[in-house]
Amino acid sequence: DMEKLAVKIRPGADAQGKNPVEEVRRYNRELKKIRSFIRSRPVKNDFEILFLENFEKMYRTADDILARMETSGCRKLFEESVSKGSVVHGDYNYHNLIMLRDDIAVTDFEHMHTDIQIKDFCYFLRKAMEKNQWKQKILEAYEEVRPLSEREKEFAALSLAYPGKFKKIAGSYYRSNKAHLSEKNVEKLQICIRQTEEKYEFLSRIFPLNL
């Protein structure tokens, strides 16, 4: 149970997570950089057209989340988590879980570091819900084991609301060979856009985000 570990990690390279406010600020810069690149292309393919059609809405959300993070308790929560040595797995998803008869084993701890512990849950929830729809029961089950503070709920809401999948797919395309566009890339972006609406509907039911 990562949430109950009382392990202190020795300071060193990659032993500490990133400040979430600065991380989102960097993500937003990357999104604008990708848009500038795509805009500059004289002939745009299907992926680029779809990206530009949805960029403004996605970026407004990303920018709004950054503004809220800057005035929220996220920065303080991060500093306190690092100071007290709160541990996260760093790659907590179903690939690293082994179902036993009466328990669950967690594997692959090479990304473990100090950070906001709720990040593990946010990462797992995002991965699981993208494949199984967004359902409130998983959050309720988590809080039965480990109730969240108001600051943690605020961070979880903002973290989950950020259009990270949109940025990830766009970034992957930006770094790829543009001469060989795969239909799979377009399909991934289409699914991401559809799931983003489902995600916001889910979040609006449990967090006062008003996105």
Question: Predicted regions span which residues?
Answer:
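Active-site acidic catalytic loop and adjacent metal/ATP-binding pocket
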Residues: 2, 67-117
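Short, internal acidic amphipathic alpha-helical interface segments
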Residues: 9-12, 144-146
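Internal "kinase-insert"/substrate-recognition segments embedded within catalytic cores
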Residues: 1-11
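Active-site activation/catalytic loop segments of kinase-like enzymes and analogous catalytic loops
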Residues: 114-149, 160-181
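ATP-dependent phospho-/nucleotidyl transfer catalytic cores
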Residues: 10-87
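ATP/Mg2+ or Mg2+-diphosphate-binding catalytic cores
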Residues: 167-211
